[in-house]
Amino acid sequence: MGPSGSGKSIIAMNLARQYALAKNVPAYYVQLSPEQTKTSLILGLRLENGSLAVKNGVVADCMERGGIIIVDEATHSVQEILLMFNSILDRTSVTAIGDKMIYAHKDFRIVFCSNDSRYSGNVKLPQSFAQRLVSFYFDYPTAEDEFLIVEQIVAEECRANDVVPVSLKRYIIELMREVRSNTYPLSVRNAATAVL
């Protein structure tokens, strides 16, 4: 967890990529929102050829295949969705609907990313869910690291000669760092946009 734009999701995606390559398993990504349901995310009944059938969501597929899944924007969901992860996060790591039970493969991993509690629009994490997690706080990178990240974003986005003076880029980053707040959580994405 950490402030918006601190690099949590990209770090998690890189971690997932490395894990998937090392274990030869799939990597998944899902971004939570209030509109999602247990059926769309985990496991549930869906209409198929006029009948209700039990179908896996992305989380159940990942559990069965022993993959790693990044669940991004966890605090932009609703508490009821987060609580549905409790049985998956338990030692038994199981989910069920009706008579279908899915036990997680031994290589299954799940990583949640979320903004910290100061971010407006966050849903409060249910205590029973939060107690099942190990959390790491990601703050904004140093000014020098932010400069290097902006350089990389500009190089990848422009695909042309970068004509913006280094001194101007450093000024933009310092200004961004000076005005950054919970109300205005400016990040390297904003600085790169200013440079572009």
Residue ranges of each PLM-predicted region?
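AAA+ P-loop NTPase catalytic core and its hallmark functional loops
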Residues: 1-170, 174-180
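The conserved phosphate-sensing helix
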Residues: 182-195
